[in-house]
């Protein structure tokens, strides 16, 4: 492969390696970051890491009704969905600029396009 006009292949390779390193560091930071999701006006709260690991679930005792378990289940699902949206948004913000036009590291999905 021939370098572009005035281009230096070793400099291009070094730049690509540096970008990949920055992307991997950002992915690691994202995996360790925590987001808080909630539903029912804060009656059910969850804490989820960027990696998807659920760290905590907090349920207000007023929502616990043995005769209406479905409502509590819906609130937990809603809080998880809220946290999932926040993780996606955070990934777009942190990885989008780094991954734009640059392939993701092997085994990693490409970053979502901004505005998706």
From Swiss-Prot:
Top-level lineage group: Bacteria
Pfam family, one: YbaB_DNA_bd
Ranges where the record places region Disordered: 97-116
A single GO molecular function term of this UniProt record: DNA binding
SUPFAM superfamilies linked: YbaB-like (SSF82607)
Biased composition annotated in UniProt, kind: Pro residues: 106-116
Gene3D superfamilies documented for this protein: Nucleoid-associated protein YbaB-like domain
Predominant localisation class: cytoplasm
A GO cellular-component term linked to this record: bacterial nucleoid
UniProt KW keywords: Cytoplasm, DNA-binding
Family from the record: Belongs to the YbaB/EbfC family.
Subunit structure as annotated in this protein's UniProt entry: Homodimer.
Primary role: Binds to DNA and alters its conformation. May be involved in regulation of gene expression, nucleoid organization and DNA protection.
This protein's name: Nucleoid-associated protein MAP_0317c
Organism: Mycolicibacterium paratuberculosis (strain ATCC BAA-968 / K-10)
